[in-house]
Amino acid sequence: MKFWKRTALCLALCAALLTGCVPTADTASSAAPTDPLTGQEALWPGQRPVAVTIENETSSTTQWGLSSASLVLEALTEPQSATSLCLVYPAVDAVPQVGPVAAGQDLYWRLLVGQQVLPVQRGGGAFDQNYLDYYSLRAVDALEVGTNAFTCDTTWTSRPLWRTSGNALAGVLRSLNISSALSESRLTDAASSAAGESESEASPTLSVPPLLPQQTEGKLPDASAADAARVQVQFGADNATGFVYDAASGTYKMLHADGTPQLDANNSQQAGFDNLLILFSASSLRDDGLTLDYDLSMGGGVWLNGGHLWTLTWTQGSDSTFAFYDADGRPFNLLAGRSYLALVSSLTGQELTVTNSAGKALTAASAP
């Protein structure tokens, strides 16, 4: 644990010193717009991504939409509760049946604010609502629109498996005065400038900065470890998410805390990801004594892809939400693809364990 703390601190200092004098990793320009969630070719240019919070308790064995989400976020926002997942899709039209829809979390909206996401939730706490109000964001909330956009198999007034879909969401956007298209007024300064420079006789397609710095090809830093076969992110005593590397597909397959496959109820497929990002972040208990606030300025972490592991330092980026630095303090890009991102805090004793195919630990670190 001390080694990880020293390593993260050294890397963070190197990154901070180098940020001002070393250019960020350059991404090759392309005529085709890229998806801000995956770094791949955008199939829905000009559309707002959709972010849906879903239940992830141990008893949540029925989850819809996992296997087709471009990005999945996970963090413990209440020390005495289970984590929720945030499934992110590139557009309303890309949203399959998804659920069970859970309470909104301002942490997820903070992470995704640069991508102009459309939040979908089932109610939310005071911090969630305050964040939405402060930034004038309108969520599609099951407690507001009810059966106009959400369905369930039990009595609506109980705690059912509420779920929705892109078609259902599209049917209520007009009545909620929500646009599914990107808005120039909400673009970041960098994105607005880029859009202005590319203006021609035809109006340019609006775009937003990517969440992660990603590339389809290019040199990567040397991996810190190979044969990273199994991953366990422990959020609490009975609250964990695991992954096992599948060489045939080149992805990390998602596991429940008990080691069983985490399946998508839409197609019975196990959720799999090209990239795993486990980012360590300092956290503190908020004034309500119930919820955690995370420091999103910088920290350490690991990246896994293709059965390899890299240690990294992360900070806020200029061309993307996150910027990553290798063990030598040099900026680098992740490979394009679907990603799982977990924020791990030391406040509740959360930890990460990575083992090779022989079961030998490659890392066993508590969050700094």
Annotate each PLM feature:
Residues 1-11:
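Bacterial N-terminal signal peptides that target proteins for export
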Residues 28-73, 79-368:
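A surface/extracellular/periplasmic glyco- and lipid-processing/surface-interacting theme
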Residues 17-20:
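C-terminal motif of bacterial Sec signal peptides marking the signal peptidase cleavage site
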Residues 22-25:
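Bacterial signal peptide processing site
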